[in-house]
Amino acid sequence: MSNTFATLPVMAGDDVPAGPVDPIFNRLLKDRIIWMGEEVKDDMANRICAQLLMLAAEDPKKDIWLYINSPGGSITAGMAIYDTMQLIEPDVATVGLGMCASMGQFLLSSGTKGKRYLTSHARVLMHQPSGGIGGTATDVRINAELIMDMKKTMSELTAEQTGHTLEEIYRDNEYDHWFTAQEALDYGFVDKLVTTPDTIGNNQQGE
């Protein structure tokens, strides 16, 4: 049987994880900041889900801040993060910087509405899922059906997050669609651009 899994295409980049066990990142957790700075994979998703649950248990009323600089990756791993964000009580504010591509884009726009931020020189990429095709004809058909189902689910959620129609999302994610920070704001992926330290600093400190 073919071991094929649907993914969102990953943009080329450094394969070295962004220091998930580094003391600096652990220190950020004390301020309720989670750093997502690598390809979305199962081990990374498990870590972020655990951090979300831990911070929610520590204070269910205080916002959690998810910083995203990611080329995308596994849909199933990304959806585990998404589902955890929806299940916990605290609002999850998202801050995109650098590149938010594929699943990185989806998680950025999945933050609590009104609390989705993007730095002024960040870039956002939206496109549809893809998967490796191999194995028997039945395997190929099953994998294709899985990809189409995931495309529908993610497109429906993205339409809800951005205020666009499903038809508009299907049109715009058919091929690689890059957005500047301003274009991402206009499209509805985020609610505000980060132009000064106070843009998000006051929100983090004033909860």
Curated annotation (Swiss-Prot):
InterPro entries: ClpP, ClpP/crotonase-like_dom_sf, ClpP/TepA. It catalyses: Hydrolysis of proteins to small peptides in the presence of ATP and magnesium. alpha-casein is the usual test substrate. In the absence of ATP, only oligopeptides shorter than five residues are hydrolyzed (such as succinyl-Leu-Tyr-|-NHMec, and Leu-Tyr-Leu-|-Tyr-Trp, in which cleavage of the -Tyr-|-Leu- and -Tyr-|-Trp bonds also occurs). Its EC number is 3.4.21.92. The active site is at residues 102, 127. One of its GO terms (cellular component) is cytoplasm. The keyword Protease applies. The keyword Hydrolase applies. It comes from the Bacteria. It is found in: Cytoplasm. GO terms for biological process: protein quality control for misfolded or incompletely synthesized proteins. Keywords: Cytoplasm, Hydrolase, Protease, Serine protease. It is an enzyme of class 3 (hydrolase). One of its GO terms (molecular function) is ATP-dependent peptidase activity. Fourteen ClpP subunits assemble into 2 heptameric rings which stack back to back to give a disk-like structure with a central cavity, resembling the structure of eukaryotic proteasomes. Cleaves peptides in various proteins in a process that requires ATP hydrolysis. Has a chymotrypsin-like activity. Plays a major role in the degradation of misfolded proteins. Belongs to the peptidase S14 family. This is ATP-dependent Clp protease proteolytic subunit 2. The gene is clpP2.
